Amino acid sequence: MIALDTNALVRMLIEDDESQAKRVQQVVVSAEKNSVQIIILPEVLIETVWVLESVYRCTRKDISQFLENLISTETFTFPDSTVIRNAVNHYKKRGDFADLLIVAQARKHKAIKFFSFDKNLQKIFPDYVVEKLNQADL
């Protein structure tokens, strides 16, 4: 197994540095030929989404499509693809990808509530993200 960093993932998608994009593509092709998995860590996905939004001004639709394609490719593996899919599904509609991934992780770990002052998250998950806890929640 090998891991890809954010800059490699971005080069693969954006192809703004032809030499680096080709090198990443060679790694992917070699991994496929040799049945080697390429792991993409959640932190790399968070950083990748941030770079695509902030630096390259990619649309939410394009980023969502990229993430879905990445998750569907057999060569790539993720520590918890179900959690990542959940975050991507919410990200398609609205929200910050990092926050959505954090909430998905909290749910995976069976947190009964998610305490946050983030109003946008509260709107997306009104019964789960709260800024006040009741005694029954503890």
Say what each PLM segment does.
Residues 1, 104-138:
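Acidic, PIN/NYN-like endoribonuclease modules and their adjacent C-terminal/linker elements
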Residues 1-40, 55-61, 133-138:
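Short, well-structured N-terminal submotif of metal-dependent ribonuclease cores
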Residues 8, 44, 83, 101-102, ...:
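Alpha-helix capping/helix-boundary segments
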Residues 11-13, 51, 124:
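Residues that scaffold the ATP/ADP-binding catalytic core of kinase and kinase-like folds
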Residues 28-29, 71, 88:
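Regular secondary-structure segments
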Residues 57-68, 75:
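Glycine/small-residue-rich phosphate/adenosyl-binding loop
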Residues 74-115:
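Active-site neighborhoods of divalent-metal-dependent phosphate/nucleic-acid chemistry enzymes
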